[in-house]
Amino acid sequence: MHHDHLISTIKKRRETLNINQEALAELANIGLRTLKQIESGRGNPTINTLQKLADVLGMELKLEVIKK
């Protein structure tokens, strides 16, 4: 599932950069609880929240809409 891959990518990048959840939440200006929910797969992040995380982690968020 794409959602699982996205969450896994964010978490792995955070860990690669040796940033703990508290620091990432603060740097991205999102709640720690929100970040924990996202990383555990229980959250439903907005595109804005994902963009904030991507910016802090030095990643690019790319949204692609395709016809099935």
Where are these regions (language model features)?
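Short basic helix-loop element that most often maps to the first helix and adjoining turn
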Residues: 8-23
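A detector for short, charged/polar N-terminal pre-domain segments
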Residues: 1-5
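DNA major-groove recognition helix of helix-turn-helix/homeodomain DNA-binding modules
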Residues: 48-62
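Alpha-helical residues within the helix-turn-helix
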Residues: 15, 26, 55
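Conserved hydrophobic/aromatic packing and binding residues within compact polymer-binding modules
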Residues: 10, 24-25, 35-38
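Recognition helix of helix-turn-helix/homeodomain-like DNA-binding domains
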Residues: 29-43
